[in-house]
């Protein structure tokens, strides 16, 4: 998913409007990606992924 966003940025960098939209999509993608890695770290501390998922 992240690589598709990066490819879209490269392919549409000529158009300013679509570039802004794609950057917004990419920042949203990064936020969800960071949330996933945060869950992984929480599951390491808790020893149980279900506990960390319940926190959301």
Curated annotation (Swiss-Prot):
Top-level division of the source organism's lineage: Eukaryota
Compositionally biased region (Low complexity): 1-18
Positions of region (Disordered): 1-21
The protein's name in its UniProt record: Putative uncharacterized protein DDB_G0280433
